[in-house]
Regions:
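Acidic, metal-coordinating helix/loop segments flanking the phosphotransfer/catalytic sites
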Residues: 19, 35-54
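Acidic catalytic/metal-coordinating carboxylates
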Residues: 38-41, 65-71, 90
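Short amphipathic alpha-helix used as the core "switch/output" element in two-component signaling
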Residues: 44-45, 67-79, 97
């Protein structure tokens, strides 16, 4: 693409001089010259054709001088537009003033065309650099916009409302969850859904990695898990089938840890399977805390055709569960110390409120602990109370 140069000078001979000297570059399409005879005419041309690259302007002109034109050009706020000022030899005051106003360079009359050519080439290098930076900034802005859209889409995937149950069992539980991605989008997710008239299914999961790849794998995993879970009565069999599907077309180093529980709201009977996930905290009605016993299984998508185990426990009214991802326990403070499971269980033991109160207590303590340390992993919590 031709370098577009606007020459602004009230001397008519300069137009002939420039077109003659640069005729080869003009013929090759490297340079494209336009001419104005004063600042007013030049400014009008700039406003009508804002794609000029270089302004070659005399300082002393009628109607609008070069310094005034330079000030008006600065108002256009185009960092890719470079101004080369032309002044009489020895007119250092005007040259200094032009440079202070942001001129790229200057040359003196009589014009040394060889020197002017080198100055134009230097300006062209700067223009190419600025335009490349502008393009990269535009691409970054586009990517950020797409990530914002992806974030909104991911947020719509996560459930917002509790599943509907008859009044006879609806009052037996409360549940709250939250997810805070380390980047625009994350690989953690949670889910909860009605299986039948008395059973509630709930899931927390953590995909390996972060960012867009993890978010895509998260959406796939969540869809497969939920689809199978709604028609499969067994936690273990649900994870086995999901693992089989994820392993068929697995991407290298992509897997997902999952805790899946099914709670009978009428009896408090809890069945669960754990595919390599952090064991949830069980908070008994009297404040005692313990970690649910792991089932010893590995993450989904890592190894095909393996069985998964299922364990059971019973909740009584007043008992609560806190499910979490390792972004909680592995969060670090400014000294490099991990938040850890012990701090988490201590918070659970001291918080006696609703699931939302429990989540608030954990996130508040986490924020106080990490301080100014940037979040390095997705943080997800799901709290459930049985009443």
């Amino acid at each position: 693409m031709a370098l577009k140069i606007l020459s602004v000078d009230d001397e008519a001979d300069l137009e002939i001089l420039l077109t003659q000297y640069f005729r080869r570059k003009i013929k090759k399409g490297e340079y494209e010259f336009s001419f104005a005879h004063n600042g007013v005419e030049a400014l009008k041309m700039l406003l009508e054709h804002p794609d000029f690259d270089i302004i070659l302007s005399d300082i002393n002109m009628p109607e609008m001088d070069g310094l005034t034109l330079l000030s008006r050009i600065n108002e256009l706020r185009n960092p890719a537009l470079k101004c080369i000022m032309v002044s009489a030899y020895g007119d250092m005051d005007n040259i200094r003033s032009a440079m202070n106003k942001g001129a790229f360079d200057f040359t003196t009359k009589p014009i040394d065309l060889g020197d002017l050519e080198r100055t134009i080439e230097k300006a062209a290098e700067q223009i190419a650099f600025v335009k490349k930076a502008q393009d990269e900034h535009s691409q970054l802005a586009s990517i950020q916009n797409e990530l914002h859209v992806a974030q909104e889409i991911q947020e719509t995937i996560l459930p917002k409302e509790l599943p509907c149950f008859d009044e006879s069992v609806r009052g037996h539980f409360d549940l709250k969850a939250c997810m805070k991605a380390a980047k625009y989008v994350g690989g953690d997710f949670y889910d909860f859904f009605r299986i039948d008239s008395t059973r509630l299914g709930f899931i927390i999961a953590d995909v390996s990695g972060k960012g867009v790849p993890a978010a895509i794998f998260m959406a796939i995993s969540r869809t497969i898990l939920r689809t199978i879970a709604l028609s499969c009565p067994s936690c273990a069999d649900c994870l086995r089938q999901t693992n089989g599907m994820l392993s068929q077309d697995s991407v290298e180093d992509m897997f997902v840890t999952v805790f899946y529980g099914i709670l009978d709201l009428g009896t408090g009977h809890l069945k669960y399977s754990n595919a390599g996930h952090n064991p949830p905290v069980l908070i008994r009605h009297d404040g005692r805390t313990s970690l649910l016993e792991p089932t010893g299984d590995i993450a989904l998508g890592a190894v095909p055709d393996i069985p998964y185990c299922e364990k059971e426990t019973v909740l009584v009214p007043g008992d609560r569960l806190l499910l979490y991802t390792d972004g909680v326990t592995e969060a670090m403070n400014t000294s490099g110390e991990l938040f850890g499971v012990r701090r988490l269980t201590d918070i659970c033991a001291s918080s006696s409120g609703s699931p939302q109160d429990l989540i608030n207590a954990v996130t508040s303590s986490l924020s106080d602990f990490t301080g100014t340390t940037p979040q390095s992993d997705d943080i997800t919590l799901l709290a459930l109370s049985y009443r």
